[in-house]
Amino acid sequence: MSEQAGPTDGGPIERVDFVAVPTKDLGRAVDFYGSTLGLPRSVYIEERHYAEFETSNLTLSVIDAEKMGIECEPVRSGIALHVADVGQARAKLEQRGVEFEGETFDTGVCHMALFNDPDGNRLILHHRYAPRPSGSAERVGAAA
């Protein structure tokens, strides 16, 4: 087996289009992702129980899980949101009432700060400041 990841054998998956973010209160979530985080909203269809927010490369599809017949289990693994400066972004969100889990930390290649949306979905402010470690696979299709 190869140590480096590379193109697949032409499988059917091309990319990730959206990540579903469950909520129990769609109006509250729309306010949080739009007003608090400042993400542009592209769709809000209350009668269909969802809204979508855009980042430059991925859509966050906020769904009223229970109204769609799905158990509302928060995303705990985390959704990493790229920012230019974690410290500045954190300070701005703290001014808007966001509470963070612990201090901002440095992994040696990036800075991260963890927080939750009102439903307990973990979000991460993230900024990579160093190249990927040597020996790690390059991301297929990533901009140079």
Language-model regions, residue ranges each:
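Vicinal oxygen chelate
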Residues: 25-27, 79-122, 130
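Amphipathic alpha-helical segments
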Residues: 25-41
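N-terminal beta-strand motif that seeds the catalytic metal site of vicinal oxygen chelate
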Residues: 1-30, 57, 77-81, 129-144
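Short secondary-structure junctions
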Residues: 38-44, 100-104
